[in-house]
Amino acid sequence: MPLFDLKSPYPPAGDQPQAIEALAKSLKNNNHYQTLVGVTGSGKTYTMANIIAQTNKPALIMSHNKTLCAQLYSEFKAFFPHNRVEYFISHFDYYQPESYIPRRDLFIEKDSSINDDLERLRLSATTSLLGYDDVIVIASVSANYGLGNPEEYLKVMEKIKVGEKRAYKNFLLKLVEMGYSRNEVVFDRGSFRATGECVDIFPAYNDAEFIRIEFFGDEIERIAVFDALEKNEIKRLDSVMLYAASQFAVGSERLNLAIKSIEDELALRLKFFKEQDKMLEYNRLKQRTEHDLEMISATGVCKGIENYARHFTGKAPNETPFCLFDYLGIFEREFLVIVDESHVSLPQFGGMYAGDMSRKSVLVEYGFRLPSALDNRPLKFDEFIHKNCQFLFVSATPNKLELELSKKNVAEQIIRPTGLLDPKFEVRDSDKQVQDLFDEIKLVVARDERVLITTLTKKMAEELCKYYAEWGLKVRYMHSEIDAIERNHIIRSLRLKEFDILIGINLLREGLDLPEVSLVAIMDADKEGFLRSETSLIQTMGRAARNANGKVLLYAKKITQSMQKAFEITSYRRAKQEEFNKIHNITPKTVTRALEEELKLRDDEIRIAKALKKDKMPKSEREKIIKELDKKMRECAKNLDFEEAMRLRDEIAKLRTL
């Protein structure tokens, strides 16, 4: 029976059918690695969705940055509205890991800020994987970082049934063991409250509903689900499965074993420091670890508890830590891992372990942490790439690694469903590049189209932006200090024609879907390096491939080897696309989706609230608007539209002060 119900208004087209067939066949033949080489705008995401539906396995889709993860999450939610599409990225808004700088004798404490919504989504992902098979998880590099033991997590899980005998007091203690905190004042995610024989539990992995358990003596008489906002009953249940409030929750038996294991390791390490006559490190480690043990014994947690993860999971020293892969593979279940933009993602995954190990080794050496802290780490690249699952690498420009691993299991997706061609390209002398590009920009702007310009340095981007602004052009630039929300706002403004030219350095590559852009200019294209490598050039040139008038200008003094390879690949693809269009009588046409749909503009409620004279508004009317805005705010947060959610939150706060 099919696990996944793929919904789409259009069938596969262009090169999609043959790519789907070839890759699905390779996966069904149990090949470990396969690669999809798909050009920009060829519908790689839709191909991925079809492959998931055909292979009928839970899937993990990994990408190298949060912006692309959010984009993929939105698209897969639309493709699979009746399945469990989950989101798993870092839950930190801000994170400063603990570290020690010996030459300055400076210890930097860990400092972090956890995003409540992202934490909920992470818990939702792990609980879905433990309870269902029709799950697709969109994840960042966070999927490679350590988590609790999924089998221990299942042990802590509770199935609650109507009619079963349970001591009321023991039930409350069990909730505490599962990581839930009692709070009679602020009832929110991960908490419970008890009034008389009625216990309300707000699951940590759900912000829309809470569960009410009603006792009669020591018997569960009734289970109901309530809407968290409206406080009205939604449905009654015969039983409910309640998962722990944390992925690191463990039972009392495992907790006691962990404490004993930490004590044993501490004794060995203190003996080592004493033998080495390192009394400063001896006293430092003794004081810090004993304090942590006191906290763990009393509350089950301590600050920096992740550094003791090996003791709680039961792993041996240097053994591969538990991570999201273990939740996907629970009960020896088969699953598929899709690595999107693999040419960037795989090198990023490969560099994670070394940086983490370097920092923690210093902490261990100077007595700030036990050696077991080194086992709280991301996966090594070999551990990741040899996981017991199937891999599909997806990229317009795969590296040698992906192609070598996949051998003959490589599918090309060069023909776009829209008939659009890879852009024309032209090399021009870089001596007068600023003036020459200015003349080209005027022609593009006259056609009501947009321009992307990529430079090598931030200074050049700023100066170019300044020059063109002085010459009367509407221009802005993006740099690395701009956060994801502001970045999306700038891209939205470009599409809405609030300005015509966007200048950047390394921000104009993967994941930018801008059909309005018909001209991409690459300044100093002959300066060999990461930003002007074959892969970077092809990716950047691809930004002009969503417009029928797509054109790329490369300013250079010479044609480098990277440029030559990029030109050969682009020319090959364009020739193949032109031949296909000629045979099938297709005329390339720019496909522009409705901006309102694409950009998710959700201003209606705020406009209504602002238009009303709030100080004259009847209290009942004001409460009604607050309720509507609150509901919309939660929807926005659930859909990861945090910018709109924050605006709605601020508007609600203003209304409540009246």
Curated annotation (Swiss-Prot):
Entry GO MF terms: ATP binding; ATP hydrolysis activity; DNA binding; excinuclease ABC activity; helicase activity
Organism: Helicobacter pylori (strain HPAG1)
Function: The UvrABC repair system catalyzes the recognition and processing of DNA lesions. A damage recognition complex composed of 2 UvrA and 2 UvrB subunits scans DNA for abnormalities. Upon binding of the UvrA(2)B(2) complex to a putative damaged site, the DNA wraps around one UvrB monomer. DNA wrap is dependent on ATP binding by UvrB and probably causes local melting of the DNA helix, facilitating insertion of UvrB beta-hairpin between the DNA strands. Then UvrB probes one DNA strand for the presence of a lesion.
Major location (coarse): cytoplasm
Ranges spanned by the short sequence motif Beta-hairpin, renumbered to the chain: 91-114
Classification via HAMAP family: UvrB (MF_00204)
InterPro entries tied to this protein: Helicase/UvrB_N (IPR006935), Helicase_ATP-bd (IPR014001), Helicase_C-like (IPR001650), P-loop_NTPase (IPR027417), UVR_dom (IPR001943), UVR_dom_sf (IPR036876), UvrB (IPR004807), UvrB_inter (IPR041471)
Entries under SMART domains matching the protein: DEXDc (SM00487), HELICc (SM00490)
Domain Helicase ATP-binding span(s) in chain numbering: 25-178
Any GO CC annotation of this UniProt entry: cytoplasm
Cellular localization per UniProt: Cytoplasm
Domain statement: The beta-hairpin motif is involved in DNA binding.
Domain Helicase C-terminal: 433-607
UniProt subunit comment: Forms a heterotetramer with UvrA during the search for lesions. Interacts with UvrC in an incision complex.
The protein's name: UvrABC system protein B
Binding-site residues for ATP, renumbered to this chain: 38-45
Pfam family, one: UVR
Domain UVR: 623-658
Keywords, ordered alphabetically: ATP-binding, Cytoplasm, DNA damage, DNA excision, DNA repair, Excision nuclease, Helicase, Hydrolase, Nucleotide-binding, SOS response
